[in-house]
Amino acid sequence: APQVENPYPFPLDTFQTFAFDAINKKENVLVTAKTGSGKTLVGEYQIKVSREKGKRVFYTTPIKSLTNQKFHDLKEMGYSVGIMTGDIKFCPDADIVVMTTEILCNLLFARAQWATGVKPVQSEWLASLSLNNVDAIVFDEVHYINNIERGKVWEQCLMLLEPSISLVLLSATISEPQALAKWLGDLKQVPIHLISTQYRVIPLKHTVGNEMIMDAKDRFYPDAYNRWLLSLEKIKKGVADHKEAVRDRRRAGYESTTLAKKDRKYSFVHQLNQTVNSLDEKGLLPALVFVLSRKKCCEYAAAVESSLITSSDVASIRHIVKFHLHRFPELETSTQYHELMGRLEKGVAFHHSGLLPILKEIVEILFGRGFIKLLFATETFAVGINMPTKTVIFTSFMKHDGQGMRMLRPDEYTQMAGRAGRRGKDTEGLVIYLPDRDPSPLGDVQRMMTGGQQKVSSRLDFGYEFVLRTYYGKDMDWKDLVKTSFWYQQHLANVASYQADYDAELAKRSVYSIDDAMGEALAERRSIEDTIAVSVNATKRAAQKKLDEWKQAHPEPEWERAWKNQAAYAVHTRTLNNLSVHMECLARYEESVEITVGFLRANGYLSTQLGLYACSIREGHPLLMSWAFHTKLFHNLDIPQLMACLSLFMGGDEKDAPLTLNDSTFISDKSVSAIKELTVYAKKLEAEEPSYSNWEMDFYWLDVVIRWVSQENAYQICRDYGVYEGNFIRAMLKLSNLAIEWCTMAEQAEDIQMLDKLRDIQPLIVRGIVVPDSLYLRM
């Protein structure tokens, strides 16, 4: 390892030493390491080095909660820190600005668009978020570049950043990171150091029941898992026999409460309490329990019987909660608040995306300080939030991914399990599988726990959003931009791979010495042979005669040898044809983008005011929302009805059946007419558009928005519609951004009447519990 000065009061790991050396040379770094390995220190060292030079640093994260937490952590280190997310904007000219990656991407495109007359949304904030004097950008959780929906944002940022800005990329372990590193090295023409480590500072032990199924060296023990499955089967049989005995006694006229109570000990809740008590006795708390369902998070937290903390801890919790939440008196009417407070006084809590943001943060603060001994959380808690624990418990390995239920991928399991084991506190982290339903099969579990990590693939797409952003950006020709992308590097690699396969297949086929003319003659014989096989009588005799004539015209041994080889020759020919099709498709990517350009031009979105509107939109559907404004479709609606129409672009909440327009009670006839007209236009575009896009509008929030903008109570609305309070806040903040985008188009159009109508819209939306605030900003 290179010799570097260590500014910290603890020894550096080897991979950190290599990373520090690269940063000192102002060279780029890509670190891939497991959760809890200390890769965050690399980003913090870059900040230290840049600040010593008097330079600024941007720090990007994939989620708002991680952004808020990182803001607090860096502020605690004594730095001048700003924060920029979709909801919170504070001190964008600070020495260090923490932001979501989408904010950085919007800034990079906005810089190119200002020069062409496009006014991006919230341009005053973006203008103040200057790249001037920025020495480096830290991309935390950069493995998000692999995310199907959002990965393109990371790729676009890396494409558009100037080579003079140093890059520190921090990633979970990924497969074949060399391709990503090579692309960045070629693109920036700056050396990049790929520093990968599989080492875990705190080893993990993975268990089921009393069986260890994977050790600290990642050796999986299938026999142990099978023994546990067998023990579960015996228990299940015992429960079934017991229930039958209860039924027999009841049929005989007896009522045995003793027997009836026995099956409770086999219930999941009983096993959960038994496990928690055992962990408490053995000093293996705190524990993080992953429950991949928001509803069950709350249910299981409520089912914990024991108190896991002292009366002194309870007093401390009350003091901390009062200190942080006294500014939010409206919480007293929140069901979630009272549910959570009841759990907290036992040292138990829950954390999921539907929880009020400030309640999520109070849980994080209390967990970080050691007052929460048992936390039930969904997967989002594993993403980046630096909250290690002693023990991790999985209640299921199955998750819903929007398409259906599936097993966790190896990378997802690794990240979640990796929360176990606290550096400097534990010698070992414990991971327990305690299924709340039938356990996953052995093969699925083994693949999940020992399988390889996901290969990094480009998620860049060339839909209308990409074309609009590049078309209205100064010096942004899409053809040139594509050639700087990770997608293009992978595209060239695929072309080369297919060409190599084609050449190899051609060489294999050439062994059989069958040219095209021979191939046609052999195909003729195959046809005759097929006729003989299925014919009878005169037809068969005629075909046999044809075969004899064919053999006379094509004498042995050359033709007989060719006939024997023709099956293999045909297989190689089919493979070559398939490869040709793939190569042709790869060669035509420019054509597919040109079709999208033609689609936008034909519908009036290029070199037009309509196109400028569309280019301004980030939250809503660019084409539909801009068209609705351009045609004044919603202009005659009052404010609650206009906001309801904008809610069409907010996306729905999880419901078994999507709502329809007819399900709305409060929508006006004028709004219904406008929505139907917009739906017709959307169907027209969907029929014309060359590639798949989402043209669906969602009616889930119509009545919720009308009632909220009409000044009704948030908690009552949530109760009436069964909406999680956290989801409600997130949706209303998105509505606030949609209203800002609508105002931006009105400013571009100099539509004084619309601007006057919406002058006071924000206080109607952003009020009460709907506030873009974070406890981390005030700590």
PLM features: residue spans?
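Helicase-associated low-complexity/disordered flanking segments
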Residues: A1-V29, K55, V118, P203, ...
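Conserved P-loop/Walker A NTP-binding site and adjacent catalytic elements of P-loop NTPases
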Residues: F10-P203, G209, P286-V291, C298-S312
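Conserved C-terminal RecA-like helicase domain
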Residues: F58-T60, N68, K75-M84, S267, ...
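Conserved two-lobed SF2 helicase motor
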Residues: D93-F109, K346-K360, I365-M387
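Catalytic acidic motif of RecA-like/P-loop NTPases
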Residues: C105, V142-N146, A349, A382, ...
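Conserved interdomain linker/interface between the two RecA-like ATPase lobes of SF2 helicase motors
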Residues: M159, S166-V168, T173-G185, Q189-A303, ...
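Non-catalytic terminal extensions of ATP-dependent helicases
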Residues: A349, G354, G368-I372, R459-M779
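Conserved segment of the helicase C-terminal RecA-like domain
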Residues: M387, T391-D401, R406-R447
